A protein has these predicted regions:
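Acetyl-CoA-dependent GNAT
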Residues: 13-105, 116-118, 122, 159
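Conserved glycine-rich acetyl-CoA-binding loop
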Residues: 90, 103-117, 124-126, 137-144, ...
Length: 174
């Protein structure tokens, strides 16, 4: 079957509930991202059941919003917007963008920019004035996505993460 002339269908949405199919697709996309070095903290994919439980848990936490991206109706990436804890009244104006990834097989279609744009729209609709995020310095494509949307780097941590016994630089943005 030829894909010549195929126009990829892309979409991004904030979701409250995931179907079992969604959880499976999200787990597969996250695993692919982890294996390509872009796995929001994981260095190696956990067992499938652990990954699936992780995504089930995300939808149970009221202070988390899950944003998913689809390529040809298959989940290909996501991120989360998290609220500060209730006891942190001094920072209630800001939220955190976390667990951002796009599976390697879905890159190059603009999904990363769409995910970040949806995150910004969601944060604004929830009354947040600022989005904070942090990222390993090795995550070049994620950094490009954030900077293209106007996020400004405000800090660097030389000991942000440890990969294969080596410390990895991390960047903080708002």
């Amino acid at each position: 079957e030829s894909l010549l002339g195929h126009v990829a269908k892309i979409s991004v949405e904030t979701v409250d509930q995931l179907t079992e199919r969604d959880i499976n697709e999200l787990s597969d996309a996250a695993e692919a991202a982890i294996l390509s070095g872009g796995g929001f903290g994981w260095l190696l994919p956990p067992p499938k059941s652990v990954m699936e439980d992780y995504w089930r848990g995300v939808q149970m936490i009221p202070d988390r919003h899950l944003i998913i991206a689809r390529l040809d109706k298959v989940i290909a990436g996501s991120c989360q917007i998290t609220r500060p804890p209730k006891n942190n009244e001094a920072q209630k104006f800001s939220c955190q963008l976390t667990t951002f990834f796009v599976a390697p097989w879905a890159r190059g279609h603009g999904l990363a920019q769409m995910i970040v744009a949806e995150s910004e729209a969601l944060a604004k609709s929830e009354g947040f004035l600022m989005i904070n995020l942090d990222v390993r310095a090795t995550q070049d494509r994620a950094i490009q996505s954030f900077e293209a949307r106007g996020f400004k780097r405000y800090a660097t941590n030389n000991y942000y993460a440890k990969v294969c016994d080596d410390y990895v630089l991390g960047f903080y943005y708002h």
